[in-house]
A protein has these predicted regions:
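All-alpha prenyltransferase/terpene-synthase fold signal
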Residues: 1-328
Length: 328
């Protein structure tokens, strides 16, 4: 069954719900809305609402919760762009470029608080147990994502980051919000602990596959489709799985080519391209295989839930496959 109409309708509903709490005027609200209105796949709220629908949750409450995780995601993007000094996000100037760093920090703070306002709206009328579980789940996500971002920044000054450290970092920085989205969908539908555990497993493995694919796109993607400069991860010194594997497997000459450009914001285009070529040769196939492995783990977790077929279930299944084949 074609689920595109289901997805399109959900995106419209989530967008309207998010904007309903960000209708204020002036630079603060304009800056806060900028990232939200700048595009995005809305994967996290789609996961949350689809899970809730499958398990019999209330659509209106799921929409508020879905809007909450997307607004929280936008908060992290605004602050990440400041820390990484990124000039573009989805092909448009970042918030701090347009409004300055102080206003961008405030806009991120506002989005953070608005995510809690939205989850409170989702939880009205729910049992105290459900309220506490949902708030604990969302709060844990903020803590874990912050820890992941701190690790990502720490890794920029290291050349000895291991694959295990990388997986731990992306589990926290990226995959945690996918896991939180799936889990919150179950919490709102009052699913049992076994289902909640499997939903988290689906989300965490999906998120890891998503981030590995994102790292690959940073090396192989089209600049116009990505909406940011290619090789920006190399320039910023990001320890992606491609960099980690190549530094471990490469010859002294290959390592030197990588390290000349890695984290060097004044690197020439030729130096960046040379480093990218080495990464492609040494680690691209490995990264693709690793992304597929985590995609398959995500599918296994979903299958273990024994959920009924339908557009929502098909969306969750296809998402686990499509995240490793995307072009942007």
């Amino acid at each position: 069954m074609n689920y595109q109409s289901y997805v399109d309708e959900l995106i419209k509903q989530v967008d309207a719900t998010m904007l309903s709490v960000l209708e204020g005027r002036g630079p603060l609200y304009e800056a806060a809305r900028h990232t939200l209105l700048g595009g995005g796949k809305r994967l996290r709220p789609l996961i949350l609402v689809a899970v809730s629908d499958i398990l019999g949750g209330e659509r209106e409450k799921a929409l508020y919760a879905g809007a909450s995780v997307e607004v929280l995601h936008s908060f992290t993007l605004v602050h990440d762009d400041i820390m990484d000094q990124d000039q573009l996000r989805r092909g448009k100037p970042t918030v701090h470029v347009l409004w300055g760093v102080p206003m961008a920090i405030l806009a991120g703070d506002l989005l953070h608080v608005k995510s809690y306002q939205l989850i409170q709206m989702a939880l009205r009328g729910k049992s105290s147990e459900t309220v506490l579980r949902a708030l604990d789940t969302l709060t844990r996500a903020v803590v874990v994502i912050s820890e992941g971002q701190a690790k990502d920044m720490e890794f920029e000054s290291r050349s000895d980051v291991t694959e295990a450290e990388y997986i731990d970092m992306i589990s926290k920085k990226t995959a945690e919000l996918f896991a939180t989205s799936a889990e919150l969908g179950g919490v709102l539908a009052e699913a049992d602990e076994d289902k909640l555990r499997k939903l988290r497993e689906y989300g965490i493995n999906l998120g890891i596959a998503f981030q590995i694919a994102d790292d690959i796109l940073g090396l192989t993607g089209d600049e116009k489709e990505l909406g940011k400069p290619v090789f920006s991860d190399i320039r910023e010194g990001k320890k992606t799985i491609l960099v980690i594997k190549a530094l471990h497997e490469g010859s002294e000459r290959q390592r030197k080519i990588i390290l000349t450009a890695l984290g060097n914001r004044s690197s020439s285009r030729d130096e960046l391209a040379a480093a990218a070529n080495v990464l492609r040769d040494l680690s691209l196939n490995y990264a693709l295989k690793l992304a597929e492995e985590y995609s398959n783990k995500s599918l296994s977790a979903l299958d273990s839930l024994n959920i009924a077929s339908g557009p929502q279930a098909q969306f969750l299944r296809d998402l686990a496959t499509l995240v490793v084949r995307r072009r942007k």
